[in-house]
Design a protein with these regions (language model features):
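Two-component/phosphorelay signaling modules centered on CheY-like receiver
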Residues: 12-30
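The feature encodes the CheY-like receiver
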Residues: 15, 54-60, 81, 85
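Acidic catalytic/metal-coordinating carboxylates
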Residues: 33-37, 60-63
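Short amphipathic alpha-helix used as the core "switch/output" element in two-component signaling
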Residues: 40, 62-74, 91
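Active-site beta3 strand of CheY-like receiver
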Residues: 45-51, 56, 78
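C-terminal output helix
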Residues: 85-87, 101-114
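AAA+ ATPase active-site-proximal loops
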Residues: 131-170
Length: 170
């Protein structure tokens, strides 16, 4: 499955450069020029990663970041800025940004950061699937009166630190 990236920058040359290099790396890339357009694009088809400029017309990147992370917490966001400060980078990170990159952008660094962020996405998906497998592997099946009573007892004792031994056939 192709990983999808949304580039959000009001400078068309930056969008084109990032779109070109990331497409060459095998990613499916879309580009928009404002925070509002980004939110609409994410609502229609959430990407795996967003490259988001801080200084955008209308809604700025930090406001867009807040909304993106509240509505789509699984989407990784890398912030970009030509006038960034340490305070801005810290604020972006606290709001949920994966990383912060300063302009002029080193395309090598962007590719490296994108790969790391998408590795994190892959690991989170894998972790979720493994947890589901473990849960379903040890799930009690059946709807008999005895099984339902057993499930109720387990539900009651589960929050405690007590050791429980369940014995019976099979």
């Amino acid at each position: 499955m192709y990983k999808t990236i949304l580039v959000v920058d009001d400078e068309e040359s930056i969008c084109q450069a990032l779109q070109g290099i990331l497409t060459d790396e095998g990613y499916e890339v879309r580009a928009v020029g404002s925070g509002e357009e980004a939110l609409k694009a994410i609502e229609e088809d959430p990407p795996d990663l967003v490259l988001l400029d801080i200084w955008l017309p209308g809604m700025d990147g930090l406001e867009a970041l807040k909304i993106i992370k509240s509505e789509n917490p699984q989407v990784q966001v890398i912030m970009m800025s030509g006038h960034g400060t340490i305070e801005t980078a810290v604020k972006a990170t606290k709001l949920g940004a994966f990383d912060f990159i300063e302009k002029p952008i080193s395309l090598e660094k962007v590719v490296l950061l994108v790969n790391h962020a998408l590795d994190l996405v892959r690991l989170e998906e894998e972790n979720k699937l493994l947890k589901q497998k473990v849960t379903s592997a040890y799930e009690l099946i059946g709807q008999s009166k005895t099984i339902l009573e057993l499930k109720e007892m387990i539900r009651i004792v589960a929050p405690t630190n007590a050791w429980i031994l369940i014995m019976g056939e099979n």
